[in-house]
């Protein structure tokens, strides 16, 4: 049987995801078989499990931290917002139905049974299960129907840790208010408090620690210092609010990413950040980079409509005429074609719309969703290299362009053994693919960046450091947690 530990928060972005990742890596480093778990997650950032099911990217990342093969049981319920208060409900990796909140709430008991199935599976197959809660664990207007927080600790028998972000201010009020608003049966599950993102001298918190323990009879088990050097994947698009420039700010190569209104899987661009200056651009902005990325999106037709309304379509065409490099991923790839056909308005209110026309390609929506871990080979001029990625798309594309990838596994454009498209227009290179994670393949990533290096007479790069950087940061996070938290009463 597994030992269950749960991390809940006083608010969203309190540090739950990071703390779970760090505990998973710490336990893995000690030789335990560890699984992360989040019963219900809401995110447009998702990846594909070993069963070819869809799970939130946060649980996929936590699985990597735990050195575990990502499973649908790590995130049995995934909600993907579609707009108008409706979300696509993913159950055990497979699209279940589209529901608004009231409809979803009516299915609570059915979904809770699915969650229990996953808890039973994890209990039988792992030494430790580290559970992440969602948002605040004490939204009193939602407690009756909450299947993502302390109800899960109660079901699994988990010891719970409450984490709060001191960087926001009011940390002790947040902790006290949360504890006092919780029902007694859930309050007693809390075994300790964690203060996250502290800067300064710990001595100034001593009186606060003593008072909060006196008031709640629950100890503060640690304080995690704010560490700006940690490089960790972001969980969802909230992280992009106010984020514009990141990556290697000294790099002579600039990458622009169009900030789609319903951007999805934006972490696809992260592998470029060690070598390039990265910049999100809005629909009204000019394109100033050497490489332009059209990322994934939940609604390709909506983004195409917005690009036209704001003149971004014309800016992209001018960028191509001037020799720019374009990479479209999934929804971004679809916008590069001649037409996006959505007769049933499955993508939103726009319906069928003409695309950028950079590829001789048409995409049709309303199909069964392709959810695949995929592999194949890229052959560009005299270059040949194997790549892997994952597919999450309902659009099927028929392209008359040169395929980017010959598939050995996957669905690709329309189940025809090929994925993506590739085209050279003058000095401009246009790439498109359904492969999320394409830039995690160092040979393709280096090929893309070296096109710019060659144009600018810069030194070529031959880096293969993305996975290494991830593991270094996870080990650093693990050490930070082990040095600053007393988990001895919880981890036995």
UniProtKB/Swiss-Prot annotation:
Transmembrane segments: none
Active site annotation, chain numbering: 330 (nucleophile), 436
SUPFAM superfamilies found in the cross-reference section: Class I glutamine amidotransferase-like, P-loop containing nucleoside triphosphate hydrolases
Keywords, in A-Z order: Cobalamin biosynthesis, Glutamine amidotransferase
Pathway(s) it belongs to: Cofactor biosynthesis; adenosylcobalamin biosynthesis
Family annotation (PANTHER family): COBYRIC ACID SYNTHASE, DETHIOBIOTIN SYNTHETASE
Name of the protein this chain belongs to: Probable cobyric acid synthase
